């Protein structure tokens, strides 16, 4: 990426764009905002003037019941009742405006403000997402993403539907795709993180379905009562217009209309279902609601699958950790005993190689560097101090040698306090070919004025050869390594190298950590059960059971922690 100061300033300005207070909507939809207490209209889109045949300024201050009929307002009140702030919810359909045209009304509440979004009602019957959900369930985890792309295309009619997963560096990769031939395939291509800036990702978490009916639409500005203390927060408005940079991005891609459906796993944005069309395309509120439900169901399947894999992996690693502890327990010379448990210790963590540096000696297993490389890793770790964990996925960070194939990433944890003993974990180099949708080092172009950036104009596949790095170390990897360290320190507590440093070490820290993690998994399971909605009575019984188990685990963690 360019290091030009003007380019960086423009790029920073793009990343800081306050798109949640953009102050305009996409027509032909209309936005009305009124105060929950008092019912006074405090904001309205400019095109409301045409719908209600009055000046938009004349709408401000009017009681909402004089503008919207009571039956539709009752549906709005029901839709927002007892709900926390969140995305607009389809309230119903009613006659609106001077000529009583049929409009779908969606609504959400934000504090004392109620947002009503009105869209012309379609005469077509809304899709049945039930068959799509069954199709996802019948394909199993391996076929889920392709089935999701196909079912979204069937429900929405978009030319290209891609399932796009975010990776550790913020970039995204297209893992599945459904095409009808009007747009080119992007399957297998990767997009740089800068394509979706942080503030946009935050909004994807808040509002799970977003549609742009026409990238060339003229936004309708929102007028608001000057007494409102701040610009109107439009985070949850489905009609909210889009950053001009994003619209230009879509036009450069040859896309005339788009829609995105968020995939959320463990409370984080896992990815998107990105839908593109070769010509403008309206998606009615009923269809968006069906696609929202389908996206949430797919998210639940992904979340459950990830949780199941995590539990299975950690159970296997815990068994290996227990094996290490059992074999070292009671040995007169635990250091000598370590030679026989290094393979089990390696299996207890997510690494390709392990080195224990004890009393100036190296004990190693798996894929590790030569002696000189181990010394280089130790120097790198010592320079970062013994008070924290040090890790890197880049071989050049710690190893000056050219050959880092067998040991590229390193995670270093000090053993004991006040001594030079270390636990080193290594990961092999991951050489790979990445196909980018356009050059990742040229994600933007500076406009002629030099004041703003525009998106790139080419999305042609560009090949990059990646080497010199391993799979990155995640927080979970560090936690597993720390647990192994506890086991090793406990076993070595009576040896000369660590004497006096670990007299208080016992099994409690590991037990407390595992109890807290079991509790966290139960909370996540409860969230998945909420999503499954098996029936109120059954769900309440499940929650009571989970709460009881969680209390027991919490007591264990509190006692042992």
Positions of predicted regions on the chain:
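Terminal helices and disordered tails flanking the catalytic cores of nucleotide-processing hydrolases
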Residues: 1-15, 321-334, 340-459, 472
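Signal-transducing coiled-coil/dimerization helices and immediately adjacent hinge/linker segments
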Residues: 21, 29, 136-162, 166-167, ...
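Sensory/regulatory domains in signal-transduction proteins
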Residues: 25-125, 159, 170-173, 177, ...
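Conserved oxyanion/phosphate-binding beta-strand-loop segments in alpha/beta enzyme cores
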Residues: 108-125, 206-224
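Bateman (tandem CBS) regulatory domains
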Residues: 128-134, 228-232, 317-325
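GAF sensory/regulatory domain recognition
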Residues: 166-222, 357-379, 387
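Active-site-adjacent "gating/activation" loops or surface patches in catalytic cores
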Residues: 208-254
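Regulatory loop-to-helix N-cap segments in sensory/regulatory domains
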Residues: 237-241, 276-292, 424-426, 430-480, ...
């Amino acid at each position: 990426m360019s290091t030009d100061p003007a380019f960086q300033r423009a790029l920073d300005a793009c990343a800081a764009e306050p798109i949640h207070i953009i102050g305009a909507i996409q027509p032909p939809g209309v936005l009305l905002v009124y105060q929950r207490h008092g019912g006074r209209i405090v904001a309205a889109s400019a095109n409301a003037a045409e719908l209600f045949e009055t000046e938009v300024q004349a709408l401000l201050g009017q009681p909402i019941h004089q503008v919207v009929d009571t039956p539709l307002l009752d549906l709005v009140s029901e839709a927002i009742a007892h709900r926390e702030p969140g995305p607009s919810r389809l309230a119903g359909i009613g006659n609106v405006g001077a000529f009583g045209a049929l409009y779908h009304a969606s609504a959400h509440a934000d504090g004392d403000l109620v947002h009503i979004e009105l869209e012309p009602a379609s005469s077509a019957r809304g899709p049945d997402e039930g068959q799509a959900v069954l199709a996802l369930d019948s394909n199993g985890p391996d076929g889920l993403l392709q089935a999701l792309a196909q079912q979204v295309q069937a429900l929405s009619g978009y030319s290209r539907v891609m399932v796009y997963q975010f990776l550790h560096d913020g970039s995204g990769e297209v893992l599945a795709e459904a095409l009808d031939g009007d747009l080119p395939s992007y399957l297998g291509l990767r997009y740089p993180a800068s394509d979706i800036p942080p503030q946009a990702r935050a909004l994807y978490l808040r509002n799970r379905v977003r549609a742009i009916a026409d990238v060339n639409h003229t936004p309708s500005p929102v007028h608001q009562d000057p007494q409102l203390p701040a610009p109107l927060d439009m985070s949850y408005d489905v009609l909210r217009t889009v950053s001009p940079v994003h619209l230009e991005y879509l036009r450069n891609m040859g896309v005339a209309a788009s829609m995105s459906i968020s995939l959320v796993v463990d409370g984080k944005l896992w990815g998107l279902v990105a839908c593109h069309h070769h010509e403008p395309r309206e998606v009615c509120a009923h269809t968006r609601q069906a696609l929202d439900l389908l996206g949430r169901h797919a998210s639940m399947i992904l979340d459950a699958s990830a949780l199941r894999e995590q539990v299975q992996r950690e159970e296997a690693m815990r068994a290996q950790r227990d094996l290490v502890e059992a074999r070292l327990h009671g040995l007169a010379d635990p250091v000598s005993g370590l030679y026989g448990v290094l393979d089990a210790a390696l299996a207890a963590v997510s690494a390709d190689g392990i080195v224990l540096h004890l009393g100036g000696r190296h004990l190693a297993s798996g894929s590790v560097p030569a002696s000189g490389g181990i010394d280089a890793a130790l120097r790198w770790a010592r320079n970062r101090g013994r008070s924290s964990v040090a890790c890197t996925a880049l071989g050049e960070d710690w190893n000056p040698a050219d050959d880092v194939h067998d040991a590229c990433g390193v995670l270093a944890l000090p053993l004991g306090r006040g001594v030079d003993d270390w636990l080193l974990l290594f990961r092999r180099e991951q050489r790979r070919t990445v196909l980018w949708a356009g050059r990742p080092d040229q994600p933007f172009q500076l406009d002629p004025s030099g004041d703003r950036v525009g998106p790139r104009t080419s999305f042609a596949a560009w090949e990059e050869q990646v080497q010199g790095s391993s799979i990155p170390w995640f927080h979970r990897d560090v936690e597993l390594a720390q647990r192994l360290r506890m086991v090793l320190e406990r076993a070595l507590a009576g040896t000369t190298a660590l004497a006096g440093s670990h007299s208080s070490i016992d099994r409690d820290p590991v037990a407390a950590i595992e109890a807290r993690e079991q509790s966290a998994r139960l909370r996540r399971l409860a969230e998945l059960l909420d999503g499954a909605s098996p029936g109120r009575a059954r769900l309440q019984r499940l929650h009571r059971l989970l709460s009881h188990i969680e209390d027991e685990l919490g007591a264990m963690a509190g006692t042992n922690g």
